[in-house]
Amino acid sequence: THLAGPDKPPGWSYNPSSWIRRWLGIALAVLGFFLSRYLAAHQLGYIPHLWDPFFGDGSDRVTCSALSKSFPISDAGFGAVAYVLEVLIGFMGSRARWRTAPFIVVSFVLLVLPLGATSILLVIMQPVVVGAWCGFCLINAAALLISVPLAVHESIAVGQFLRLAYKQKKKFWSFFWLGGSALGYEGKDPDRTRWSIRQRWAASYQGISLPWFIVLQAIVGVWLMARPNILPYNIASADCDHWMGAIVVTVAAVATAEVTRTARFVNIIAGVIVLILALLFSSGSTAVLMSGIASAVLLILVSIPKGVIVERYASWDRFIK
């Protein structure tokens, strides 16, 4: 039949479109919706003040800043709508939607990635432009960073499927919109009805790992973002650390997915930039200078290891360096 075929992509050790792989991303989108809804209620004047779990009146200052008001609509409200779409798309399609409905997967990825990039950009601009932090904005950004490695696996599977269709001289756009079969391959999703809670939890983030060197990259990034508040020096140095810290954390989050583990090399470049910026803007403060040098060297060193790749991704294996 037109859509006959396996659940797992050919050559993969698991199914990135299975329901157990989707629930975590959907749950994070639901969390993002309620947080964005709360922030939007303040921006639109429905509640007078925001409660911030970490930064006092920081959320009030950020949501009412000139930066937020520069958007033609409530940025938090727009984010809430995007999260609703993310939840709806997360529920769409069968457990083999990587081949039965590729356009759904592509739509999901195109929604998650720009939303994540925008969220990170706004987080960077909070201390740089506004001079304050928004606690719920940071929680939202963290949830999005977790969603990105969860979503990227399906996009790889879709890309491989469409490439196979193209090589077989089949109608590309027909396969993109209507899906297709993968006859000749086998791979059914396992029956998880008797699985323990621990087994189900492990299956929900299959293909994602948190090796020690990725953890250290994230710690360096968080330190760079927090350094201006702990070791204040000058505005130029603080702005550089805010920008570089957010970039380092973002790259580390993307690299937690085995299919995008190669992204960690970007943090080697980031480490070199941190070193140069420390020498340029922190030379008047020994503590800030040493912090920049130590952060840069550590970041470069921990961005080299690849770690153990547990799963298999067919032709994509050769791109995991």
Residue spans for each PLM region:
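Terminal recognition/anchoring or ligand-binding modules at protein termini
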Residues: 281-321
